[in-house]
């Protein structure tokens, strides 16, 4: 057993024995303190999606870093899609085109009480966007800095896009994601640096897409003592309940599919604010509800599953409506899915090999059910090999307890840097 362990350690050591790879690892270690400082600076700038000045400020901070690395940087103004904009950094070179994806914004707007980077201990820090995803942005920069210091970056063909509206995409969405889609043109590989499942033993090779739906119901009002009469009917609320339960009966349990009616209102009069996802309803106990509405989301792993779910929901609405009611169901597209592909699996295998060679252990694909929506999904039809969730790890993102595991900053950076180097040199 001991002999096998010694042999294993020898193999791990020898697998990164090539001088360029050793130099990359050493350079990442040397730059870790600077990376931590950059992370703290970025987190201390509020960049809630709707704080345009803050998003631009984080973009300026990172832009200087890319400029110093020899990238040609561009700020894409977001006025056309009602957002701050995006940072694009391009480094033409030889070898395969590789796209790296990050985002500058967070869910924490200026009115949030959660505003500052706080070091908890040597291993952990808390702060708004520290893992989602300023930590991932810093992993990108630290990996490129390590490659530059080791003399390996100059020949690389890399483009980086850091969007300014990942947490709340601009409108129209097509315009908001055009810079990302354009950057993906000709790319053979793409890496997204979201925090993923928060566990460095996993990365993302598939993501479910998101869309929204709205069910609006009209009924015949009248005195409650007359409800269920054929000429009065059941009212809007009963029809809303019938349809929602039909969705549950027909679709619940289908693999990778979820649907959630998140906001329900019913009564004599409704006031719905769809932007802020809230509203008011008024009615009396002795009056039959005339109007009802339900708003929710739908998550699917493929275009085919999305269409199947929508068709099923439409059929439920159309079948046997309750007397004197009518319902209307509408859909709105959101983030597309990132389906699992052979190319994604092969890229993960290379990332896994780099991790093992560094002594960090294996990396497996996380279930798409545990992976939310992200920007890489918009390029799933263009780039054959995509992985995501390889940024800084931690827990409680999108909450005032968002916490980073700082011990994963150098390890995630080394994994990314070694993978980029090997992809450029040719898969081992």
Q: Can you annotate each of these PLM segments?
A:
Residues 1-4, 155-156:
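Positively charged n-region of N-terminal signal peptides that target proteins for export
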Residues 4-12:
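Sec-dependent N-terminal signal peptides
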Residues 17-23, 47-48, 195-196, 205, ...:
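Metal-dependent amide/peptide-bond hydrolase catalytic core
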Residues 19-129, 148-154:
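Acidic/His- and Gly-rich active-site-bordering loop/insert found
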Residues 36-40, 59, 63, 141, ...:
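Extracytoplasmic/secreted envelope proteins and their assembly/folding machinery
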Residues 100, 121-171, 211-217, 226-251, ...:
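Alpha-helical metal-binding/catalytic segments enriched in His/Glu/Asp
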Residues 109-120, 206-211, 274-279:
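Short, flexible, mixed-charge acidic loops at enzyme active sites
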Residues 133-208, 266-276, 428:
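Acidic/histidine-rich catalytic neighborhood of metal-dependent amide-processing enzymes
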């Amino acid at each position: 057993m001991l002999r096998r362990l010694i042999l294993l350690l020898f193999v791990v050591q020898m697998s990164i024995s090539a001088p360029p790879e050793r130099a990359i690892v050493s350079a990442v270690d040397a730059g870790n303190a600077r990376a931590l400082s950059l992370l703290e600076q970025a987190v201390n700038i509020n960049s809630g999606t709707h704080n345009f000045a803050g998003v631009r400020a984080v973009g300026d901070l990172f832009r200087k870093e890319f400029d110093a690395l020899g990238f040609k940087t561009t700020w894409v103004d977001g006025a056309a899609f009602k957002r701050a904009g995006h940072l694009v950094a391009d480094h033409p070179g030889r070898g395969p085109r590789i796209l790296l994806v990050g985002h500058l914004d967070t869910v924490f707007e200026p009115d949030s009480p959660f505003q500052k980077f706080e070091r908890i201990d040597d291993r952990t820090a808390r702060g708004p966007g520290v893992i989602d995803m300023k930590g991932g942005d810093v992993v990108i920069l630290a990996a490129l800095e390590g490659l530059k210091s080791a003399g390996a970056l100059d020949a690389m063909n890399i483009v980086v896009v850091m969007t300014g509206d990942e947490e709340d995409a601009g409108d129209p969405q097509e315009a908001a994601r055009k810079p990302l889609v354009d950057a993906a043109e000709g790319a053979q590989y793409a890496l997204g640096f979201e925090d993923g499942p928060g566990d460095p033993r996993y990365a993302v090779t598939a993501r479910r897409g998101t869309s929204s739906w709205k069910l609006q119901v009209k009924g015949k009002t009248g005195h409650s003592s007359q409800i269920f009469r054929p000429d009065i009917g059941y009212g809007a609320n009963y029809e809303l309940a019938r349809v929602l339960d039909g969705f549950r009966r027909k679709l619940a349990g289908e693999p990778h599919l979820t649907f959630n009616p998140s906001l329900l209102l019913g009564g004599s009069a409704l006031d719905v604010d769809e932007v802020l996802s809230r509203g008011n309803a008024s009615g009396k106990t002795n009056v039959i509800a005339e109007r009802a509405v339900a708003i929710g989301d739908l998550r699917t792993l493929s275009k085919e599953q999305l269409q199947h779910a929508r068709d099923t929901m439409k059929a439920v609405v159309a079948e046997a409506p309750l007397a004197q009611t009518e319902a209307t169901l509408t859909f709105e597209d959101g983030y597309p899915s990132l389906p699992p592909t052979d190319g994604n699996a092969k890229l993960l295998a290379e990332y896994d090999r780099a991790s093992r060679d560094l002594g960090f252990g294996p990396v497996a694909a996380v279930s798409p059910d545990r992976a939310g929506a992200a920007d890489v999904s918009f390029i799933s039809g263009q780039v054959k090999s995509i992985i995501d969730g390889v940024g800084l790890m931690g827990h409680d993102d999108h909450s005032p307890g968002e916490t980073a595991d700082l011990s994963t900053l150098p390890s995630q950076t080394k994994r990314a840097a070694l993978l980029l180097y090997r992809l450029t040199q040719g898969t081992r």
